[in-house]
Regions:
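Nucleotidyltransferase catalytic core that binds NTPs
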Residues: 1-131
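Short amphipathic alpha-helices and their capping/turn segments at secondary-structure boundaries
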Residues: 5-14, 157-172
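Structured helix-beta-strand junction loops
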Residues: 15, 100, 142-143, 173
Length: 192
């Protein structure tokens, strides 16, 4: 959550009560890295924002199922989805809104801030074994299959951390990697 989201909520408040479709951990993990806070923690934060009357689980990046289920008079979204991978979801949302007479309100994107940038900044701070262990437990609950790779040295670790592919609008990347002490010491010419 960042000030761009707050700007969006403030503008949406002008149209009435606000129901937020909050992506579940599973939905986020299928497109990018698992969020720092779990769904319940994020929900608690969002439902305490002024003007938010309801928070519902959004199981997928496709808004159409929630739009068909809740049939809001208006759907507010930032203009960042006009192009790129989110554009297909925009078209599906417009189609769902049209089916029952809902209206799309596109609010100008707040420049200079993004969740991805904030995640990268948090990653640069570092982590602890306890945080890594807790993240692994959450990943095991959020995804049916995890992708891990063994790394032999710091360079291959950096590659594993940053490599990804996009297929069918889904970003695939490694969920984690490990390096054995035996491999590390062997590379240094000092086997255990």
């Amino acid at each position: 959550l960042h000030h761009g989201h707050i700007n969006l909520i403030a503008r949406a408040r002008e149209y009435g009560d606000i129901t937020i479709g909050l992506l579940t951990d599973e939905a986020v993990a299928n497109h990018k890295r698992l969020p720092y806070l779990n769904w319940e923690q994020r929900k608690k934060i969002v439902e305490n924002i002024s003007g938010v009357t309801n928070v519902v689980a959004q199981e997928d990046w496709d808004y159409a199922p929630n739009l068909s289920k809740y049939k809001p008079d208006f759907m507010a979204h930032g203009s960042d989805w006009l192009q790129g991978p989110l554009a297909a979801y925009r078209e599906k949302a417009i189609q769902a809104l049209t089916e029952y007479g809902g209206e799309l309100i596109e609010i100008p994107y707040t420049e200079g801030v993004s969740s991805s940038t904030i995640s990268k900044d948090l990653q640069s701070i570092g982590t602890t074994p306890d945080i890594r262990r807790a993240t692994l437990k959450r990943l095991l609950s959020a995804k049916p299959i995890l992708r891990f790779i063994e790394t032999h040295n710091p360079i291959s670790g950096l590659i594993a951390e940053h490599v990804n592919i996009e297929k069918d609008d889904i970003k695939k990347e490694f969920d984690g990697f490990w390096s054995s002490s035996l491999t590390d010491s062997t590379l240094k010419g000092k086997p255990d």
